[in-house]
Amino acid sequence: MLAVMSDTVAAAAPLLAQHQLVELLGLVKGADSVELKLSVDAGLQRSAVEALGLDPLEAQVRLVHFFDTPDLALERAGVVVRARRVQGKGDDTVVKLRPVRPPDLSKRLRRHPGFVVEVDAMTTGFVCSGSFKGVAQEAIRDSRARGAPLRKLFTKEQRAFYAEHAPEGVGLDDLVELGPIFVLKMKGTPPAYGRKLVIELWLYPDGDRILEISTKCAPSEAFQVAAETRAFLGERGIAAAENQQTKTRKALSFFSDELKEASDAV
């Protein structure tokens, strides 16, 4: 049994060192869910969508707004503040902390229905995050248009979580908007795979784009699903990009640079 487990883990994460695998196993054990992700090179994105049999006309439109200081103080502290408009579903918000260690989180926090601990695993690494999710307390578009305080979008519990982990002296209302990013989301269950796959296409203002394929699973099945997913995608000629960029980091960097350029031009 141990040999089978070892083979499965090796197939799921061949680029990770032994000490990383040990760390990953510990994080997965304490998480609520695992999301397996890979991004695809720009030149192969269209063929990847076609190979999975997903219909772009069924894509859901999203606008993702990030908030940080102009020099990304939150990102350096491991805090992400996001508000999102979702076609047909309404607006939602999240305050995220990463990386986290599940044993370090309080039982009260773990019991809250809006708090989720998830491991994001890519071909080249992984991170465990704690996300405080909520429904936007005001319509995002209206709130931003009239210049309402940013804190008004977030629940009392989200604001408290932010205050606990944000850099000292940086309040929610001190943050600037970075975005929004236009996102298309497609999802489906390929017959030969038997699990739901999600494709997100993030379109950046400079014409660059990231296409990410992902699937979620329970922690107990993470390595088995990772191995099966790797095989399924490989059989369809879908390979992970050598440079696995994260969507959020690229968005924050892009808009931070844009703010700096605008400031320097004044």
Predicted regions: what they are:
Residues L2-V266:
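Phosphate-end processing signature that detects enzymes handling 5′-triphosphorylated RNA
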